[in-house]
């Protein structure tokens, strides 16, 4: 087999894996897609009527219940509806959101919170996702820290979310399961709402 043919096959395989992991790119059925649109509408109606800066955390009671999948699809539904939407990968223990978009973990949230990346470089760390929607952006988790709950409950996290709230209509914060670690509780004072999957 020729080298160029092998390269083409590898590209196709990577594309297929990306499409399989990216829920909307793979052609979700109507009922599932509509369920996320209903969820989007319910969240919009249940939050304070702010034009910008609605911050919603997503968590679950246990691992493998679909909270990251829900975060990805909810963010997409909000962005497709015309809202400038940021998905924050804040499960710094087992980040998975980045895999849906084939985006590297670092630099990201943890780097901003510990100061290894200055907050004035924020827009260099946030990744636009125009192949999905011109309104969709991702803040990756960053390097895995030894103290995620302390970082999420820190003043730096509150300051960062307030700054992000001036830049985006919706911020979806993907968090670890609430019954396994304290991370969702630590960040909750800075959220407008919490979705438990």
Q: What role is predicted for each listed range?
A:
Residues 1-43:
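Acidic-aromatic/histidine active-site loop/patch
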Residues 26-28, 106-117, 143-153, 196-197:
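Flexible beta-alpha connector loops of hexameric P-loop NTPases
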Residues 19-20, 39, 112, 138-139, ...:
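Conserved beta-strand/loop subsegment of P-loop NTPase cores
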Residues 57-59, 88, 140-141, 173-174, ...:
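Conserved beta-strand segments of the P-loop GTPase G domain that flank and frequently precede/overlap
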Residues 128, 141-182:
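Phosphate-binding/switch loop-helix module in NTP-utilizing enzymes
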Residues 78-138:
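Phosphate-binding loop that captures ATP/GTP phosphates
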Residues 31-99:
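Walker A/P-loop phosphate-binding motif and the immediately C-terminal alpha-helix
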Residues 177-197:
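Conserved P-loop NTPase nucleotide-binding/switch module
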């Amino acid at each position: 087999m020729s080298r160029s043919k092998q390269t083409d096959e590898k590209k196709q395989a990577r594309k297929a894996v990306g499409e399989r992991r990216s829920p909307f790119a793979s052609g979700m059925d109507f009922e599932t897609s509509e369920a996320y649109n209903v969820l989007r509408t319910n969240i919009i109606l249940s939050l304070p009527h702010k034009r910008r800066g609605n911050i919603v955390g997503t968590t679950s009671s246990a691992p493998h219940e679909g909270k990251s999948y829900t975060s990805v699809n909810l963010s997409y539904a909000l962005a497709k509806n015309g809202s400038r939407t940021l998905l924050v990968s804040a499960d710094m223990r087992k980040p998975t959101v980045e895999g849906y978009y084939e985006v590297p973990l670092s630099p990201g949230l943890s780097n901003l919170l510990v100061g290894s990346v200055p907050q004035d470089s924020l827009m260099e760390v946030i990744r636009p996702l125009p192949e999905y929607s011109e309104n969709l952006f991702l803040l990756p988790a960053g390097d895995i820290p030894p103290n995620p709950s302390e970082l999420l409950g820190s003043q730096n996290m509150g300051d960062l979310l307030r700054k992000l709230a001036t830049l985006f209509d919706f911020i979806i914060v993907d968090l670890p399961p609430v019954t396994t670690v304290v991370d969702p509780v630590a960040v909750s004072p800075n959220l407008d709402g919490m979705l438990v999957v």
